Amino acid sequence: MALKHAAAGEAVDLRPLGPRLSAARTHAIVRTSSFEAVRLVVPAGVEIPSHRVPGRITLQCIEGHAQLGLSDATIDLRAGDWVYLDGDEPHSVKGIEDASLLLTILFGPDGKTPEPLPD
């Protein structure tokens, strides 16, 4: 059964899942033409292979421990850690421990290409 997307103005519980984390699945919280928010669940030992996303992204670790693999670095993410990536930057995500993260993807006017950053 698909989870419903949050409506504008609706509070969403993003607290750590604790013992429920091992049975949890990744799900989209909301998607609009300008952004998408996803609760990303990455079990220990599982790696999301290197890929690119057209929009800028942020990842905030809610619980657990994950590693973000970049072309020139590996970043450890633990509860409370936050990272920003430019659009189209190759990256992978690996669960070191069961982890859940808040993924936000920012889209431009066409729903894909990120807005240019001001100078």
Residues covered by each model-derived region:
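A short, N-terminal "cap"/entry segment at the start of jelly-roll beta-barrel domains
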Residues: M1-E36, L117-D119
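Conserved short histidine dyad/triad with adjacent acidic residue
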Residues: A23, E36-V53
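Short, conserved beta-strand element in jelly-roll/cupin
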Residues: V41, R52-Q67
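Short acidic-glycine-tyrosine-enriched beta hairpin
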Residues: D72-D88
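Ligand-binding loop in jelly-roll beta-barrel domains
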Residues: G87-D110
